[in-house]
Amino acid sequence: YLVKSSHGLGAFFGVFSVLAVLPFALSYWEDRRNHYLCFVETRAGKTTYCWSHLCVTFLGAFLCIFLGMTAAYSLLLLKMPMLRASDAESLLYEIEMGDGKRNFLILSRTFPQMYFIASIAADAARYAFLAVTVFAASEKIKNLFVLASLPILLEYVSQILADSLGLPRWMRWYTFNGTSIDTLSDFLEISGYFLILSFLIGVVFWLLIRRRELDG
C-alpha cells in the first residue's frame, strides 16, 4: 500500500518534494540571492559551475529519496511482512499461467527485495529529474513560493497538456514510476528516461547562463 500510495500527487509527493527535492534544487537560487555567483564562476568557470551543480542536484536528490525510502521500509519490515501471503499466491499463479512479463523480478529468489529496490530507485530517479527541473527554473523564477510549488504545478500542467493534446505515453513523464517496474529492462528504461530528460534540462540551463553572460 505504501509503495502504491507514494506515486502520483498526494501527501508523499509533497513531503518528498519539500524535504528531498528543494534543498538540492534551490542551491542556484541561494547562490544568486547571496551574490556568490560572481566569486564562484570566476574561480571555477560558468560551465564547470553549471554541470557540477546539476550533477550534485541529481545525485543528491536521488540518494536522499532512495536511502530515505529504503530506511523507512526497512523499519516497517520489523513489524510488517514485505510480501503478504495473498500477494505471494497471486504471483505464483501468474507464473503458473505463463505470464512471462514479470520473469525477472518474480523468478528471482530475492523477489521482494529486488522489487522494492527497483521500485524505489525508479521513483528516486523521477524526483531527481524534478530537482533538476526546479534547479534550472530558478534561473528565471525568483519567487521562492513558485519554485517550491513547481513540482506539483509541473505534474498538473503536464497531465492537462498531455490529455488535451493526446500526447503519446513516452511524453507523459509523470506515468513512469515504481509501479511501472516489471522486469529489469523496465527499471533501466525508466532510470535512463529520467537521466536523459535531466541532461536535456541541464543543457537548457547552461544555455540560459550563457545567454545571461552575453547580455551582461
Where does each model-flagged region fall?
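Helix-loop-helix units of permease transmembrane domains in multi-pass membrane transporters
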Residues: 27-60
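Extended hydrophobic/aromatic segments used for targeting, binding, or gating
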Residues: 158-184
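Secretory targeting signals
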Residues: 1-27, 55-135, 174-194
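Transmembrane helix-loop junctions in multipass membrane proteins, especially transporters and channels
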Residues: 73-85, 143, 163, 167-171, ...
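Central hydrophobic cores of alpha-helical transmembrane segments
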Residues: 144-158
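Membrane-helix interface segments
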Residues: 45-47, 51, 127, 143-147
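Alpha-helical membrane-inserting segments
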Residues: 67, 71, 75, 79, ...
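Junction motif at the cytosolic side of a transmembrane helix
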Residues: 140, 195-216
